[in-house]
């Protein structure tokens, strides 16, 4: 009798101990994914400098064959990997705008002139303004096809309203 009672009490204590340790371990594991107090600021020769002024030497063991993947992206283009190491990420690609040639500048000026003449035609509704605006729109380059179509639609809308003699 006593042996059965002792065995049952030991089993219950073991079950309670196991559940408390699993709950405690899951609570500790969830803390790692929240906001960090220490954030890496720079990396120089495998020495990571953190924002609180501390340093850490990092090394990835040669025998570590687990695949390396990005765990977290920090500020200053610093990547944290699953094995705890840090590296700078790829440099961002900036496309520099090409220098405008004289031909493109002239094409843009023709477009601006056409826009101004169409605006004037919308105000005046005269035949001479229509001729100037239509000629300017016809001279706009094919590279500005969409803008050219918009200008032509604006001219057509004014023509539907009628001209002033």
Curated annotation (Swiss-Prot):
CC annotations in GO: extracellular space
Highest taxon listed in the record's lineage: Bacteria
GO-annotated molecular function: complement binding
Residues spanning the signal sequence: 1-29
Keywords: Secreted, Signal, Virulence
Principal place of residence: secreted
A UniProt-annotated Pfam family: efb-c
Subcellular location: Secreted
Task of the protein: Extracellular fibrinogen-binding protein that plays an important role in virulence. By interacting with the alpha chain of fibrinogen and its derivative fibrin, enhances a non-functional interaction between fibrinogen and platelets and is responsible for repression of fibrinogen-dependent platelet aggregation. In addition, assembles a fibrinogen protective shield around the bacteria which results in impaired phagocytic clearance by the host.
Subunit structure: Interacts with host fibrinogen alpha chain/FGA. Interacts with host complement protein C3.
Protein name as it appears in the record: Fibrinogen-binding protein
Species: Staphylococcus aureus (strain Newman)
Gene this protein is translated from: fib
């Amino acid at each position: 009798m006593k042996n059965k009672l002792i065995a049952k009490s030991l089993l219950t204590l073991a079950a309670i101990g196991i559940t408390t340790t699993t709950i405690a371990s899951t609570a500790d594991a969830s803390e790692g994914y929240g906001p960090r107090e220490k954030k890496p600021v720079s990396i120089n020769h495998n020495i990571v400098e953190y924002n609180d002024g501390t340093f850490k030497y990092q090394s990835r063991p040669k025998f570590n064959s687990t695949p390396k993947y990005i765990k977290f992206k920090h500020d200053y283009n610093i990547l944290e990997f699953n094995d705890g190491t840090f590296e700078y990420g790829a440099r961002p690609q900036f496309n520099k705008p090409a220098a405008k040639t004289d031909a493109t500048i002239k094409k843009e000026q023709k477009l601006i002139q056409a826009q101004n003449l169409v605006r004037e035609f919308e105000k005046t509704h005269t035949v001479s303004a229509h001729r100037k605006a239509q000629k300017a729109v016809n001279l706009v380059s094919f590279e500005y096809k969409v803008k050219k179509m918009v200008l032509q639609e604006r001219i057509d809308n004014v023509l539907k309203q009628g001209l002033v003699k």
